[in-house]
Amino acid sequence: MELFEMYESLGVSREVWAYGERVLEGLKERFAAIDQTAEYNQAKVLRAMHENRVDATCFAATTGYGYDDMGREKLEKVYADTFGTEAALVRPQITCGTHALTVALSANLLPGDELLSPVGAPYDTLEEVIGIRPSKCSLMEYGVRYRQVDLLPDGSFDYDAIRAAIGEKTKLITIQRSKGYATRPSFSVEKIGELIAFCKQCKPDVICMVDNCYGEFVEPREPSDVGADMIVGSLIKNPGGGLAPIGGYICGREELVERCAYRLSAPGLGQEVGANLGILPSFYQGFFLAPTVVAGALKGAIFAAGIYERLGFPCIPNATESRHDIIQAVELGSAERMLAFCSGIQAAAPVDSYVTPVPWAMPGYDSEVVMAAGAFVQGSSIELSADGPIRPPYAIYFQGGLTWYHAKLGILMSLQKLVEAGLAEVK
């Protein structure tokens, strides 16, 4: 059976397949650069594992309190060394990225302190955490103030407004690296470093925290290499490599991470407790594989931009722009196209390929959200997935793919569903 015939057996027409092959012809140099970054990051992870003498005893399960969990402690050293920080908190007890960010914020902000976002509105789920949308136990309910500086129309930082917003009470500055459900650009490590340097110039003791979700291993450097006091993320995204079934991390200055550990467990207990319940092999192996898995996801994102930009759909970033996270936004212009796109991603999934995604009122979001995610780990966005809120400009956010070839199939299937519904025409 020829390669095309295999794709055809999965539902991709000759027309769509041939169109995809034409797009791929122009991406060889981009793909080679991605592979080079993955090779560098693979060596970086491996060096940290060597220096910390990871061995088979690190995979032993612990229960109960989890005292003296050598594997847990060594994993946190591997994360800290890889990301160039003094300390790390890497735990299955952190359930998701929003949870990790909540721990980091609530641990380092006290009543009367001020939180500043110099990059506009945060991700939807953080709105209730902060109290922008009223919620019980939000930071605002506990007396933390929040200020926000929007980006300039061209997506750059409004440095004059940021300088004016940083005051005596400004304790922590939160920088969201990825675009979230917005159509702004994601920020490069270089740009984040420039912003951090500016904020530190305005107030040297301010804490700069970066929401690093979707950004790990996309570039050779991380925000912690350019001055971030804390970086925060989820293990069911990039650093889990598709193997971690749960978990989150906080890496940064030792005193800040220590406070996070006290907030996650209890004052006086901190990092000393937290059984691993036999989950550590997936954490170690996932982190080891993460640079390669992220490379495949990046190739998929660039391919998606190439596919849809040629058909006239606005893509953020576009097919030629540099990449700073694994997310590809495509403005489809209608709810019908969003649903068709997601049905194609779902049809290409290894799990639940026979189901049809429908919008629903997802907890933490203020609009109905449609999600396609036939994943081995529920909600994993390093696995092939697509989602978006059903609201103008009807943008779909595509990410992931444990292998490049799976990402490729998913993108072709998304286009196939649009073509079959008469919502797109291959040119």
Segments (PLM) and residue ranges:
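Conserved C-terminal alpha-helix-loop-beta "cap" of PLP-dependent enzymes
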Residues: E309-V426
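Short glycine-rich or small-residue beta-strand-to-loop segments that form or flank ligand, phosphate
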Residues: C58, T62, L89-P92, I326-E331
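N-terminal small-domain helix-loop-helix segment of the aminotransferase-like
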Residues: T63-G71, L75
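Conserved PLP-enzyme active-site core in the AAT-like
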Residues: L3-K28, D35, V45-E51, D55-C58, ...
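Short beta-strand/loop turn elements enriched in aromatics
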Residues: L75-F83
